[in-house]
From Swiss-Prot:
InterPro entries: Cyt_P450, Cyt_P450_CS, Cyt_P450_E_grp-I, Cyt_P450_sf, Plant_Cytochrome_P450_Monoox. Belongs to the cytochrome P450 family. Heme binds at C481. The gene is CYP82A1. Induction: By wounding. One of its GO terms (cellular component) is membrane. The lineage of its organism: Eukaryota, Viridiplantae, Streptophyta, Embryophyta, Tracheophyta. It is an enzyme of class 1 (oxidoreductase). It comes from Pisum sativum (Garden pea). This is Cytochrome P450 82A1.
Amino acid sequence: FVLNYLNTTTIAFISLISLLFFLFRFSKVSHTKEPPIISGSWPLLGHLPLMRNTQTPHKTLGALVDKYGPIFTIKLGATNALVLSNWELAKECFTKNDIVVSSRPKPVAVELMSYNQAFIGWAPYGAYWRQLRKIVTLEILSNRRIELLSHIRVSEVQTSIKELVNVWSNQISSQYGLLDDTKSSSTNDEPSTTDYVSVELKKWFAQLTLNMVLRMVVGKRCFGDVDVENKEEAKRFLENIRDFMRLIGTFTVGDGVPFLKWLDLGGHEKEMKKCAKKFDVMLNEWLEEHREKKGLGSEDKVVGERDFMDAMLLVLKDKPIEGFDVDTIIKATTLELILGGSDTTAGTLTWAMCLLLKHPHVLEKLKEELNTYIGKERCVNESDINKLVYLHAIIKETLRLYPPAPFSSPREFTEDCTIGGYHIKKGTRLMPNLWKIHRDPSVWPDPLEFKPERFLSTHKDVDVRGQNFELLPFGSGRRMCAGMSLGLHMVHYILANFLHSFEILNPSPESIDVTEVLEFVTTKATPLEVLVKPCLSFKCYESM
């Protein structure tokens, strides 16, 4: 929910209209047991004003569990939404009733910005979704293709690390003169902040993950000193991603009160159309480039050299799917892969670093694991990742505390059913509060504490892949995140290499700010400034 546009004037205007209709509203007497509905609903607006709370919506609704229990209903304008806050109810939804909750609603943002639900993640449950999901999982995001593109992930991580080492080297050289191996950061001297260089990690992770995803998807990179085609275009592209993620989570007045949609209160529909158009122009250019390359014989490329757009062109072969033409399908899928693969991955990496900086003993223990298995003379390889059990525990604990989408992606009941003994009507939206489920004290002792060790002992068999309903950062059932495997590959590999390559300090005596902002995903509200210094042999960096 992004509801800041609901300013006092807007609320007053809608409230005035609602009074004119209030006397004409009739409620039918229900003879079935329905979940409790929270108090404070406004005419027409429902509980939308409640979402303007200073807290994020998942925290606001999580605080209501003590009063209303783990299952209750809220009204989003004219639409009912079912909020679930424990794992048993989530399991009931995503197993026995999964097919009933496998469709998606169609808010204004999705209609205007996802090529009218051509995104696989936003498509309604049906033939189009099934066919495209099969293509994406078998041809685009299969483990085989992820493995074939490992050289891109390695190249991007090593390039980004080397560029950061060069920044450090240039700064130190300007301060102390030319470096030699005697001034290597691998010495055991006590650290001095003058030996470190400042880096804004939130931005660094965003640029690295975007480069990595763009190369895998369309064969391009936007940031850095190597093979960057147009830096101004890259800057605009990143800004447009930020706009998209903000707007796609916007619940407009038209969503809650459909007959007021034409007013476009707040101007969000206009902004959405503008953002979508910018992406469409760029995607058309990339698609045309790939078609030209295909005509020049790029179809004969070695499989590992094909990017995702190449693969889509080969698989679809100009055959439309359920009314969507091939160009629309490729553009929609390409954009979705870029957005989902870069933004959520960078966000998880940022939260992981926040937690590690707030808990230096955990950071030190992870560094020890890296030094034990990898040493100081080489970089981390993807083949090393499975051995790094403490790293895996840290990522799981990060995803527990900061699930990328705290309400998962919205679902919609396609028929009446029963959840938790309550009758749920067709058309109700489903909002599993993952943030609350992940902090259930009956499942997670000390639920607010960052304790990766729990995944090495009491919760060692709990995974994030949708089968353990107490931990669902990627959702579960038919509609769980299709890009989960790729995202996890990227998170583990990037974090391991970054922490193995640098010593990290908090530049401020103040604790790390972990204020959240919920757009479509939960992100850190402020930059993450850290100090870094290379800690490997310089021969290791030179070999990158």
